[in-house]
Amino acid sequence: DLCVQALNTYAPHGDYPGATVTDIASVKSLPLRQVLESGADASRYVGSHPMAGREKSGPVAARGELFQARPWIICEHEAARTECVKLVRALAVELGAIVTALSASEHDETVALISHVPQAVSSLLATRLQHTPLYALSLAGQGLRDTVRIAGSDPRLWVQIFAANAEPMVRTLYGMRQDLDRLIATLENPTAPGARLDLAQLMSEGNAGVSRIPGKHGTAP
């Protein structure tokens, strides 16, 4: 409810009645709903989400080029003033970001797949390392390190994100569970007729999926 507090503090009758309020939270439907239900001046609120960050937080982790050529999602809503939307867009452009417009629900469905579930998967895999012998961990290559890098993220932040975007995450996780069940069933009987073909199909589907990702941060491959 920080957006509601900001709106009540700055606009329309606070110290800065002409202020535009935005947020950079990782979930957009919940803040928008809170603003609309609060009775605050929703016309000056425009949700946004710069798709940039690191697994570390705080001033020490700051980078001057953090937003350069990164997507910045702006979630316009029916009550938002046009000039407020333009101001938030101008902020993103000034910081070097590439602006994308989505509704709050489109945003949350999208980031569930491209950000929130990857965080969950990385953390789950890293969990398996807790009791792994040190000699085995010393052999870990870049593949494992890349996969679990974001498992070092702040749990306090991600607990809030997961809880706020639970429904879209669950839909994606159910699909992943079906794929995992399929893989497990095949590996439990790897010499069965068609088992190798099924494994190849799973890998091919992964190849097809990763090939659809554009170049880094939305730029040309």
Predicted regions and their residues:
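Interdomain hinge/lid region at the active-site interface
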Residues: Y135-N207
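Short, amphipathic C-terminal "tail helix"
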Residues: A200-P221
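Short, structured active-site "lid" loops
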Residues: D1
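Short, flexible, solvent-exposed loop/turn segments with mixed acidic/basic and small polar residues
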Residues: V60-L66, Q160
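Internal alpha-helical scaffold of NAD(P)-dependent oxidoreductase catalytic cores
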Residues: G64-G152
